[in-house]
């Protein structure tokens, strides 16, 4: 067999210039002999593997091979083998026929011999070389080696339970006979010569494949093998759209819709083509022709290299395609527009039906309103007819109120929207004037309150109105009270005497919840207060027998803070009257006591310190303490003011004018061989003259404890003990008893304060509980109405200064320091409160 096929060019021709050159291109012969095991191969020598193309090739040095490889015979004639059509010609042939027109190739028509044709190369060819290299029919004597062995395999199988003549496996499910092989007729691929199943296979597996399916699969695979993916023609694909799909799409094509106003005058520069184009609206772009800028190139115009690969379209009409596309889009848009118009008409029908229902409701409502207005007009005309003078059935105020109640109950909407002011002026005002023509307010203060209360509910608007001309004109009841009722009140107040306050106070109390608030304020501010102020200016506390509080204080519930301008002249006149007053005159207390709860705590304390406390100090200074003959009148006069002046002021008087003299008398008495029983009684007697509140004061406690210490020192001396045996024990017992009383009193006070705090804290938030000493001082200041505030920009040793009433203090580590004459003195919280009062 010649090896000339290894030295052919890409098209199967021999290379005349270099016969020894091996071409590595894949030819048609290579493709056809791909599965041929008998094809000739060139075995590479060791020298060729080492030196490659520079190796020296010598036919004499070639090794003999078992595959029948032999040296090249140059004496044989030259033969040519047809390699079929060229690639270009094959492609042209394929492009002329479509897949649909191809003749189906059946398995019967497939060539039986896919290998290369036999070459006539001369006499050196041996027929024995037709077989496979080194191949033998080994399946004929399969297992024959067991003849020359000990049969160990058969013995092992029998030990494991194998029975000759039966299949392998637990249930003998294995095959008995060995697998048969079927020899293929030719050298083609699998299945090229029909079914290759043996008789044994058909018996064991009787299910056969469908011939039609196999044929169809074969044609499909064959067609795919022969097609060119880049240049093959495909069947046209059609896309269908239903009406529902077009409705779901629901949009109008840009080419058919009118441009928007804001986009109709936009300048657009199109640079998508080879040349720049200018459009003056987006709508012009939508009408841009779909034909490409350059025509379809002809075959003659194509470059030589492109002519082999590119294919010329056989049918290209872009204008026709464009027109067809326009028709399709126009039809789609007509369908969409028709659907939208149908939906619009349906919505219009629903909307008109709703409007019809609403119109019917409005019509029925208007008919009811007309009917109600006609009935209201009939009632008003009846009232006007009965209002005529000298009528047979004159209208009264009560009957008119019932008619208005009917209007309000049955025809509320019409009554609420009607102009009640004009209706009341025409009908109600004359009746009210006639009703109050003989009225005396101070004699019968409740006259007309019920009927006016009824008219208030009928005529007054829902909202609360203030005093203004607009509100007065819009609210019928306010106008009624101002124009009809108010003139009667003005006449009565003009004739009223302020010292006779009870009738006027009762009258205003009866009408306060009926008349408008602004009318009541006008009466109090413009009518009552000027008369009271004038009467206070004319009042003289020395000559007037009627106390001023008797005709001023009854106005407190009605006027409250309006009376504060009267307090200043009252205090001034009382101060003038007390200049020559003596504590023995008890009438001053009767005059001043009602003012204690009226005046503020600060102003009251200032008034007491200015006018009363100095007088009491002079009286207490005149007190003579005589254990043998004591006159207590001056002491009683002073202690009688205990509830009028503060405890701190009273204690200050006692410290200054009483206790020094009292302790001096005690020391004198103890130095003259006294009777300690009498001294004890005298001590207890004076202590019983003070109230518990005064005795609880620290200064008073200190003074009485000082007296006990003096008595203990006196009784501890030898002279006193010798003069009166047992006195020391009595004084010690007295001291112990007094100290125990003080302790019990303090414990009781603490318990009371704790109970008060517990009761007060039931509904109090946790934030109100004082968290530090400053908060505690602030709480106490609020309880005693004492001003507690920081002094801006003032500090002492870095501590903020505060004003506690009239006292300047600062707080350092939970201790209050009070400013003294030269230094800061620490003090207790109770002492601070007493000093501030």
Curated annotation (Swiss-Prot):
Task: Name a Pfam family for this protein.
Answer: TIP_N
- A single cellular component GO annotation: spliceosomal complex
Keyword annotations from UniProtKB, A to Z: Biomineralization, Cytoplasm, mRNA processing, mRNA splicing, Nucleus, Phosphoprotein, Spliceosome
Spell out the subcellular localization from the entry. Cytoplasm; Nucleus
Keyword set includes Phosphoprotein: yes
Complex and partners: Identified in the spliceosome C complex. Found in the Intron Large (IL) complex, a post-mRNA release spliceosomal complex containing the excised intron, U2, U5 and U6 snRNPs, and splicing factors. Interacts with TUFT1. Interacts with DHX15; indicative for a recruitment of DHX15 to the IL complex. Interacts with GCFC2.
Which PANTHER family does this entry report, sorted A to Z? TUFTELIN-INTERACTING PROTEIN 11, TUFTELIN-INTERACTING PROTEIN 11-RELATED
Query: Can you say what this protein is called?
Result: Tuftelin-interacting protein 11
